[in-house]
Amino acid sequence: MHIIIAGIDTEVGKTFVSAILATLFQAEYWKPIQSGSLDRSDSTIVRELSGAVCHRETYRLTHPLAAHQAARVDNIPIHAENFSLPVTEAPLIIETSGGFLSPCSQDSLQGDVFSKWPCQWVLVSKAYLGSINHTCLTVEAMRTRNLNILGMVLNQYPKEEEDWLLNMTGIPYLGRLNYENIISKETVKNYANLWKETWEDREAKLCS
């Protein structure tokens, strides 16, 4: 099982979701591109929160910019052919950088590069002004690429807006995130327990 975690934008909760799913499935983790925060990378955070084995990033860029910009500043050209799925028999959680259609290189988008892999996708949407539009546009872009969308995780939406989004997009609900002042290993474990039944039901439907 390979699951790619995509977002409608940057800073929507992808790393938090990755840690939860790594805990839930005892999965390994991989982030193909890390831009900035190399001393406190998303791989480091996921490892601390879940204990997951984390595969080294293909590209480690020093500036917290979009991948193509960070690569330009570092003078490290990104080539799509350099990305390859880590070899593992364990479930694998893959976290993209930024939003679904964020640049991967000077001439490619992450959504196009990573959609070539035989993976399932989870979309993370966080409530902010304009997020409903961004969510609907992202779902449309994912469907245009015929991706296997497992479902959506909703971050800090009011219940009525959750219902509206799920009804309008037709994307299955996989869990919600509340505002957390501090995210700890215990927080992640609690969410994994909360989501367990929803994910088991989703897996059962996929197998039926």
From Swiss-Prot:
Its EC number is 6.3.3.3. Pathway: Cofactor biosynthesis; biotin biosynthesis; biotin from 7,8-diaminononanoate: step 1/2. One of its GO terms (cellular component) is cytosol. The active site is at residue 31. One of its GO terms (molecular function) is dethiobiotin synthase activity. The keyword Metal-binding applies. ATP binds at residues 11-16, 42, 95-98, 155-156. Pfam families: AAA_26. It is an enzyme of class 6 (ligase). Substrate binds at residue 35. Keywords: ATP-binding, Biotin biosynthesis, Cytoplasm, Ligase, Magnesium, Metal-binding, Nucleotide-binding. Mg(2+) binds at residues 15, 42, 95. It is found in: Cytoplasm. It catalyses: (7R,8S)-7,8-diammoniononanoate + CO2 + ATP = (4R,5S)-dethiobiotin + ADP + phosphate + 3 H(+). GO terms for biological process: biotin biosynthetic process. Its cofactor is Mg(2+). Homodimer. Catalyzes a mechanistically unusual reaction, the ATP-dependent insertion of CO2 between the N7 and N8 nitrogen atoms of 7,8-diaminopelargonic acid (DAPA, also called 7,8-diammoniononanoate) to form a ureido ring. PANTHER family: ATP-DEPENDENT DETHIOBIOTIN SYNTHETASE BIOD 2 (PTHR43210:SF2), DETHIOBIOTIN SYNTHETASE (PTHR43210). Belongs to the dethiobiotin synthetase family. This is ATP-dependent dethiobiotin synthetase BioD. It comes from Chlamydia felis (strain Fe/C-56) (Chlamydophila felis). The gene is bioD.
